[in-house]
Amino acid sequence: MNEIKNIAFDLGGVVLALSLEGGIRGFEKMGVSDARQRLDAFVQKGVFADLESGRISMEEFRLEMCRLTNKEITLQDCYEAWHGYVDYVPQQNLATILRLREKGFKVCLLSNTNPFMNMWADSPEFDGQGHPISYYFDKMYLSYECGVMKPAPEIFHMMLEGQKAKPEETLFVDDGEVNIKMAQQLGIQTLCPHNNEDWTIFPEIQKLLK
């Protein structure tokens, strides 16, 4: 195994605990009656994917929600619906990420996400201690900013280039098997915890902290 120098973390289900049911309830409350068919824990589809891949703006998403629900929807309504996905932020995850950086590892975020979610994540409300998510990472590679979503190889290449890292010296931590498989095809080392599992106690992580 090559020496790890760069670590890329997924956001939902890895850095923060995710609630698909909470997200579904949020959009159902807003009036999207078929939210359960439209939403996913790993890769969005339809207009939700358009938002997370940067193909449409927040305003265009809001207008589509108005059309779907046949009523006036505000940007705040959209924000609150997306925020339903957030369960809680495990403090041990954040502490471990900081320890990895202190050990000299490059640490980045590689996430399928959208501007509504990032409004909360990159605000002082994120960790309960006044720090935005960007406080914890050297750099963030967000699908809506990159213009492409995992598992497309392009977003992995963007991350490797931005981190100036070789695939064999990179560890990718993600709870989505399809994302893990693509990373492996590109020669990236991987760790695949279950959704919301405590990965900080995994031997692969503990070894890096020694």
Where are the model-predicted features located?
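Proline-centered loop/turn at the N-terminus of a beta-strand
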Residues: K106-C108, Q189
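Anion (oxyanion) recognition and catalysis
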Residues: R101-E102, Q184
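Generic structural signal for small/hydrophobic residues in well-ordered secondary structure
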Residues: D10-G13, G54, L109, M140, ...
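Structured helix-beta-strand junction loops
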Residues: K103-G104, Y136
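N-terminal helical cap/lid subdomain that shapes the substrate entry/recognition surface
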Residues: N2-Q91, A95, E102-K103, N114
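Asp-based, Mg2+/Mn2+-dependent phosphohydrolase catalytic module
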Residues: M1-K5, N114-P115, W120-K210
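Active-site phosphate/pyrophosphate-handling residues
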Residues: A95, C108, E154
